[in-house]
Swiss-Prot record:
SUPFAM superfamilies: PDZ domain-like
Keyword field contains Glycosyltransferase: no
Biological function: Involved in a type II secretion system (T2SS, formerly general secretion pathway, GSP) for the export of folded proteins across the outer membrane.
Name by which UniProt lists this protein: Putative type II secretion system C-type protein YghF
InterPro entries in the cross-refs: PDZ_sf (IPR036034), T2SS_GspC_N (IPR024961), T2SS_protein-GspC (IPR001639)
Record's GO cellular component terms: plasma membrane; type II protein secretion system complex
Note: In many other E.coli strains this gene is part of a type II secretion system, but in MG1655 the locus is missing a number of genes.
Classification via Pfam families: T2SSC (PF11356)
Membrane topology: Single-pass membrane protein
Key word Transport present: yes
Disulfide-linked positions: none
Length: 331
């Protein structure tokens, strides 16, 4: 037992001594390393001190060897010009901008595309435009159901709920069921208007002289007879003549006045176009002026009217009883 205890104590003592020796060896090695580090740091310090001293010596030598007069920096040549240069103020800049050296600025306006006009369709109503009467109140001679009637702008057609919106030289604009429709002049009326000239009226007048119409007396109100006997110019109170234009005056549309007794008794029909008076062409504006001057001295007048493409002569007695032809003499 004692041997075992002694052996264990010896082993423990040997291990302890081994650790002590190992620790001492480590400390000795650490001291050696520290000494080497101290030597390296000391060498670096002296090296840096040597470099700094050399740099300072070189700078001092350059400062001493070069004179201050030689090393003085001369002033820039353009420096005084900068000091003396005139500065532009806002007024100068504005003056330059007003010269418009590169042209005056013109803003380009964006082009606005105009909507294209919508074409107006031709009306399908069963009506025919026979003539256009221009004047203070333009009218249109429209045929409905075989009857001709003169309508003014804004009036409504008798057989249709269509309003005359606009009257032009060769067509009429109608407003029907909220839509605008076009009623053009009939083709036969266009051709009739085209051939109605002085020569045609002259030929018609010659035929009227060669074959005069036979008239029979008709009864008219006494008030009308008395009014015409006193002043023949009052005939225009009973029969209104409105100029019809197509590249000039082609005639006068005959319409009844406030008292239509003379209009009906003389044989006029609404829509008749008077183209000649006493064999004088109505297409000449001077013919109406001559009529107004000669009317007070006339006893009767003869009107040549155009009705549905045919010409008719109507005689009116201004100072005696009124006569009208029992038949119509066509050209």
């Amino acid at each position: 037992m004692a041997r075992v205890v002694f052996r264990d104590a010896r082993i423990y003592l040997i291990q302890w001594l081994t650790k002590i020796r190992h620790t001492l060896n480590q400390r000795q090695s650490l001291n050696t390393d520290k000494e080497h580090l101290r030597k390296i740091a000391r060498g670096m310090f002296w090296l840096m001190l040597l470099i700094i001293s050399a740099k300072m010596a070189h700078s001092l030598w350059r400062y001493i060897s070069f004179s201050a007069e030689y090393t003085a920096v001369s002033q820039p040549v353009n420096k005084p010009s900068r000091v003396d240069a005139k500065t532009f103020d806002k007024n100068d800049v504005q003056l330059i901008s007003q010269q418009n050296w590169f042209g005056k600025y013109q803003p380009v306006a964006a082009q606005v595309k105009q909507p294209e006009p919508v074409p107006v369709a031709e009306t399908r109503l069963n009506v025919v435009l026979r003539g256009i009467a221009f004047g203070a109140r333009p009218g249109a001679v429209i045929e409905e159901g075989g009857k001709q009637q003169v309508y003014l702008q804004g009036e409504t057609l008798g057989s249709h709920n269509a309003v005359i919106e606009e009257i032009n030289r060769d067509h009429v604009m109608l407003r029907y069921q909220g839509k605008i429709e076009r009623l053009s002049l009939a083709e036969e009326e266009r051709s009739t208007v085209a051939v109605t000239n002085k020569k045609a009226v002259s030929d018609e007048a010659k035929q009227a002289v060669a074959e005069p119409a036979v008239s029979v007396p008709v009864e008219i109100p006494a008030a009308v007879r008395q009014a015409l006997a006193k002043d023949p110019q009052k005939i225009f109170n009973y029969i209104q003549l409105t100029p019809v234009r197509k590249e000039g005056i082609v005639g006068y549309a005959a319409k009844p006045g406030a008292d239509r007794s003379l209009f009906d008794a003389s044989g006029f029909k609404e829509g008749d176009i008077a183209i000649a008076l006493n064999q004088q062409d109505f297409t000449d504006p001077r013919a109406m002026i001559a009529l107004m001057r000669q009317l007070p001295s006339m006893d009767s007048i003869q009107l040549t009217v155009l009705r549905k493409g045919a010409r008719h002569d109507i005689s009116i007695a201004l100072r005696y009883r009124l006569f009208c032809p029992p038949y119509w003499k066509k050209s």
